[in-house]
Curated annotation (Swiss-Prot):
Belongs to the PsbM family. PSII is composed of 1 copy each of membrane proteins PsbA, PsbB, PsbC, PsbD, PsbE, PsbF, PsbH, PsbI, PsbJ, PsbK, PsbL, PsbM, PsbT, PsbX, PsbY, PsbZ, Psb30/Ycf12, at least 3 peripheral proteins of the oxygen-evolving complex and a large number of cofactors. It forms dimeric complexes. It comes from Chara vulgaris (Common stonewort). GO terms for biological process: photosynthesis, light reaction. It is a single-pass membrane protein. Its main location: plastid. It is found in: Plastid, Chloroplast thylakoid membrane. This is Photosystem II reaction center protein M. One of the components of the core complex of photosystem II (PSII). PSII is a light-driven water:plastoquinone oxidoreductase that uses light energy to abstract electrons from H(2)O, generating O(2) and a proton gradient subsequently used for ATP formation. It consists of a core antenna complex that captures photons, and an electron transfer chain that converts photonic excitation into a charge separation. This subunit is found at the monomer-monomer interface. Keywords: Chloroplast, Membrane, Photosynthesis, Photosystem II, Plastid, Reaction center, Thylakoid, Transmembrane, Transmembrane helix. Pfam families: PsbM.
Amino acid sequence: MEVNILAFIATALFIIIPTAFLLILYVKTASQSDS
């Protein structure tokens, strides 16, 4: 179970971090285009 939990956390971070990075870039680009 511990290995499965660690694998789940690692996968979640692998997905969440790049997604958050892309969202930040999108928000910055959108705010720049609006202003």
